[in-house]
Amino acid sequence: KPGTAERYLQNNYITTAKALEYFEKSVSAAVNNDLKARSMYMAARCLMNRQMAETRIEIAKTGTFEFGYFYIDSDVWKPKIKSLLATNKWIKSLQNFAPQTRFHQIMIRECSLYNDYFGENSESVFF
């Protein structure tokens, strides 16, 4: 019988695995670059959900949390988060593809999370 952590990682609500599957199909089927960039971004977010779920389990197992709050900004976890972002294939694809799209220009202006990952200062912040 799988343990709590394994059951947590099998929960589609937590990992968004099914959504990732559909966004990956959408990337392949996209009829224009903006739709392709949007699909890549959503696939990247889905993969990040999975990666963060795995990180939360690791944090819980190592006891590096207090009162239910995870210290993801701590010196212990910053390198881990950076390495997760570096291994997210959709973030890498989006970094190379999106800057030429209208979607990218809108998201840089409207979404602070997107700007953190793909804006002018993203290289120094995450990679």
Give the location of each predicted region.
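Acidic, polar-rich low-complexity tracts and alpha-helical solenoid repeat scaffolds
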Residues: K1-F127
